[in-house]
Amino acid sequence: MLRRLSAIAILSLYSAGALASDAGFRPSFHPDQLKGPPVGRRNEVLVLGTAHLSGLPNTFEPAMLEPLLQRLARWRPDAIATENLSGLQCDFMRRNPSRYAESVETYCFDTDAAHVATGLDVPSANVEMERLLSTWPADPTAAQRRHLAAVFLAAGERGSAQVQWLRLPVQDRITGDGLDAALVEMLDKSLTRRNETNLLAAALAARLGLERLWAVDDHTADSPTPPEDEKAAGEALMKAWDNPQANARRDADKPLYANIGKVDGVLDLYRAYNRPGVGLQAYQADFGAALAEPSPQGFGRNYVGYWETRNLRMVANIREVLGERPGTRLLAIVGASHKGYYEAYLNMMHDVQLVDAEAVLR
């Protein structure tokens, strides 16, 4: 009996030691230290943390983005990635409504009108979009731009359709070539719609002569909270987010938002959101606080798992763009809380060189 107990005790010690060793393990392979390529133009990525423009005070006007647009234009990106879902991802999510119905309603562009106007569903419109872009002329006609805009809308790529609309002279923003009156009205209204995709990404792309945007957001990690847990989960997370770091973050935003209408007020906001330390502040206020949330159901850990998965998939989408187009200079515009995660994950890639946003925004 004693021998058996001793054996159990020894096994327990070995198991505890293994767990302790696992907890302290650090891999010897560090891809961030193995950068390339040795020849050829590097892939460069500038991550621009942004406020969501729809949440700015009424003193904000789109013209106030001009100092920011000028600085980004001087950097001259070849590609611009936005915090939007691709049409193909939304098509997938629509086919799985039991899990994604709420996410589709919140994040996905309704392509029904474009489907009727063009006869193309989302998958076939994406095929046509790629075909058109692969043989796109250096000097397209207005009719070609209108047709591509219609195809982009049918493909669920609303931001890219906006780029084509902006590249058309005002007198050529008319119906025809796949665009009916409803789609033209939609594109016209989007010219002044207060979000960073239209007012920043599409405007910059058109200014630089680019033909499209890259929608890299991902919501496939979304899942509905069981109804019986909704109240408890909400209360647990709200309690976690009521912390000194979150309060300090909100207090720091107040003067930035109050001064939006002043000269360089918008630029000052972007400078603040792209300073070193922003990622750690977001972690301490939000994700780190959620990770420490003590509910037995692990509500905070659920949230952090979703957040990390989403950011990994967003970065994977960016890496795919770079992998297919070596030597690309890419601007990634994303909510400021994502910035630290974007940069940390992108920096792990062999063929990605990060660019300091602070230097670009000076």
Model region roles, listed by residue range:
Residues 103-170, 247-288:
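Low-complexity, serine/threonine/proline-enriched polar segments
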